Amino acid sequence: MKKIHIEFSDERLITPSGLVFVGQILGKSSFVKKINRAPISKDYLQKQIKNGDVLLTYIGMLCQGKPQYEAVREMMDDPDYYKYALGISYAIPSAETLRQRFDMIGDSLRKDIQQANVDMLREMHIEPTALDNGFVPVDIDVTPFDNSKSNKEGVSRTYKGFDGYAPIMAYIGTEGYLVNLELRIGKQHCQKETPDFLRETIELCRQLTEKPLLIRLDSGNDASENIGIFMEESYKYNNVSFIIKRNPRQESKEEWLESVRECCQNIQHPRDGKTVYIGQTFRNVTYSLSDNEEKTVGIRTIYEITERTIDRYGQYFIVPDIELGTYWTNSSLPDDTVIDLYHAHGESEQYHSEIKTDMDVGRLPSGKFESNKLVLGADKKCGDATCIIIIGNLCFRIRQDQCKLFIRINFFVFLIVFNVFSDSID
């Protein structure tokens, strides 16, 4: 066994030194100044501490994976460093002030702060990376947050079988930057209020890139209204394509197989007893326009039908096993490519995991639904929604001599909005 050398030093060692980079990035944004303009009632605690200091403090906590208000007490051990690193002007607030101030901040600065974040991205020359085919992926999905054994407002049974919330999130680029999210009660169906979320997401994405977008959705969002939104965007030459896994509903797998068996041009035999049919057809979709006029269009439908008569172990089936996968798309990409691109949509699960585990935001800190919206996202229709959080993955580029240092930082930026979106800096 090697000997362990212990050295004594007078140097000051600081564990969360990466907060310095977060403070530098926030310093380029005007959102703190705009937040400070919100009036503070004389009835609130520590009113001499500005709203910007409150938000900057909480940002520092979240960057360390500590979303609970009480974690701010750890900063009191070295207040000078945290004030310097995060740009806090007056003092670090108490846990009580954090909780109270979150409930106080309104939504009047929503547009201003959204624009401030977009401007910050532009100043940092950020553009989400596209796929090899030129499309910038936008993955949208619902991910339940487990808040079991709690009496928090809005907590209810999710489709995962536990009590919690069901926020919807949108990631852009191959990096998986979180561009938009919205907190929802656990029992809410994933399609409810999604059309408005899609429109807002497209608008936010368009401020980050002019490249063609490829939006990917699960079968829970197989709805004509969603398809109509994407088609109308494509008609406006907005370069919006989509892949949505179809919900077969009452469609018969046997009828699908019989309809493609004779006409399919791409038939594969991976092994004995297994046949895969891949191809395309067109199905009509009717959706309503903004003036309530109905419009019917033929949408390209990709199919992947697998017929198994023998399992992998050589056992014969009495009745063939049929697996059906169909996908809506308006892209002109090859059939195989469309299927592979949808399967890559599953990578967004790892982004969910970063938020819920690495960042420890899955179990929200407050018992109030509105207060938890401060931390994650807010519903447009919630009249007294307060401050919310942008969760992003930041890459801060530093040029020194002729070297480039890329430092990836899990970064949180607050917004006062009804809906939350997240930005990423590269």
List each language-model region with its residue ranges.
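An anionic, glycine-rich sequence signature occurring as long contiguous blocks
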Residues: 2, 241-357
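Short, hydrophobic/amphipathic alpha-helical patches that form generic packing surfaces
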Residues: 19-24, 53-65, 329, 376-390, ...
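Short, conserved catalytic/metal-binding motifs centered on acidic residues
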Residues: 57, 72, 89, 94, ...
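A short, flexible helix-boundary coil/loop motif
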Residues: 385-426
